[in-house]
């Protein structure tokens, strides 16, 4: 058993750590509210630009690469969105596992995979394992800024438009030397963490480019006449100015850029939620550990007092016996 002094020193140390984890928990809680508000604020713009792009795509004859399904894709880029700091439980490990699954699938399809990483933890993770990172950006995982994420968003779009046979211009954060042309790619995938609730964050992986076409089934209300030629309402056509092709060509990069930034906002909220959960668990564990150590310390103190009393009583008895013998 450890000495009483050692136990008291350890209790003091655990209490100090508990103060840190509690402070981190409170900070993460306040950041979650802000991050959620940013996600909610971005939704109206996301919904509107999605609706406009869908309308334009339906009315356009534009044969844009962003809209074309790949036929002979040979090179795929993956953007891994991780955190800049730790102490957030399994948040980053879940992202890395999801990335490994996606990478394995793409390689099985015969595609060369290029890694782009956002966040210091992801950069450290892949550098430690000797993985080749084509581009790395950090410093904004908890509070993404549209200007700060410009280079990563623009490079993914430019690299895709260039294709695996072409090159894109150099941007800040790329591994290539400044001014050197960078090889493009045929697909862009993103791995991030979707915020579901304070207690649930789910790693997601989906293809950003080319845009996956989603066909929605037409919904009919109960009692609607589906047989006769009678029509109660007519959907009006839209007149676009300038023409749909020009508008779509201008909006598609903005649409993709918005998707990347939205994923970063979701990841920021998920990171704070994961850190709050981890720090809350650490604080609870510290409280339990202090209770256990205090119990052991009290037992040690009680044993020490008992030993002292026994020694005093024994000494008094010895003195009494020696006095009687005199």
Curated annotation (Swiss-Prot):
Keywords: ATP synthesis, Cell membrane, CF(1), Hydrogen ion transport, Ion transport, Membrane, Transport. The keyword Ion transport applies. PROSITE patterns: ATPASE_GAMMA (PS00153). GO terms for molecular function: ATP binding; proton-transporting ATP synthase activity, rotational mechanism. It comes from the Bacteria. One of its GO terms (cellular component) is plasma membrane. InterPro entries: ATP_synth_F1_ATPase_gsu, ATP_synth_F1_gsu, ATP_synth_F1_gsu_CS. Pfam families: ATP-synt. Disulfide bonds: none annotated. It is a peripheral membrane protein. The keyword Transmembrane does not apply. It is found in: Cell membrane. Produces ATP from ADP in the presence of a proton gradient across the membrane. The gamma chain is believed to be important in regulating ATPase activity and the flow of protons through the CF(0) complex. Belongs to the ATPase gamma chain family. F-type ATPases have 2 components, CF(1) - the catalytic core - and CF(0) - the membrane proton channel. CF(1) has five subunits: alpha(3), beta(3), gamma(1), delta(1), epsilon(1). CF(0) has three main subunits: a, b and c. This is ATP synthase gamma chain.
